[in-house]
Amino acid sequence: MNNEQNMTQNIDQTTQTAAEQATAAQTAAEQKLAKKKLTRRIFIGGSLGALAVVGGGAGWAYNRYLAEHTEIEDTTAYEAAAQQANASASGSTTADPTELTGVKVNGQSLTANEGSITITSTTTGSGSDAVVSFVADIKLDNATLLRSAFANNKFGQNIIDTPSNIASEHNGIWAINGDYYGFRTTGIVIRNGVVYRDSGAREGLAFYRDGSVKLYDETATNAQTLVNEGVWNTLSFGPALVKDSAVVDGIDSVEVDTNFGNHSIQGNQPRTGVGVLGTNHLVFIVV
């Protein structure tokens, strides 16, 4: 994916939050902005959603798909220690910026000294056929202002929460759900420049410290190499819809997640996408 002026979109194939939850989370965020009860951070969520279990083997299914399995109890402390170690290894003495300053709100738009956020919404159809989409156009001076946070500040499997709660707990001014890492045991998971999982399995999306964003093959690299190359966050999801300003060949025949624990989400289901318009210029959509 070209990071200059080329749109690349990835769609979260495992978003399980209901449409009304996504709408409610976005509405709550807008209300907070309108009241100017502002916090200062922008977040991509960790593990979000509701799981459905069907069929027999209830004990096994509960343990695999519902029971929490915590690998890291305090991700904030874990990241602080890892970032300090990385800084010592690289000899860097410059801290990454983490907060917006000089925040001003006008309707659904926000401006700050370090960038801007503009939110728009569109409704098509009516009644039970109504589809609501929210689009956030985000411009930042520094890519590290876009941070990740985990549900309950833990890393593991089946640890869930809503985007609004995660944002509130981490002083987020805007938030969106992430790649649903917690349902899987595979994928490369890098958050805020720190490695959490290194088990390449699929196509991923890498957000770099320099503001560029690239699609990549997880099986052709490893997490530490990506961090050394300047990756700040990764999303292990897909499929890619647009690459180098063109629709990806065969996208209309790609089957989206159909496994036992995570029921099929083919057809009309809540979706989350991200697009890249240029360096440090991103667009996020929730439908």
Residue ranges and their predicted role:
Residues 1-28:
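N-terminal targeting leaders characterized by basic, low-complexity, disordered sequences
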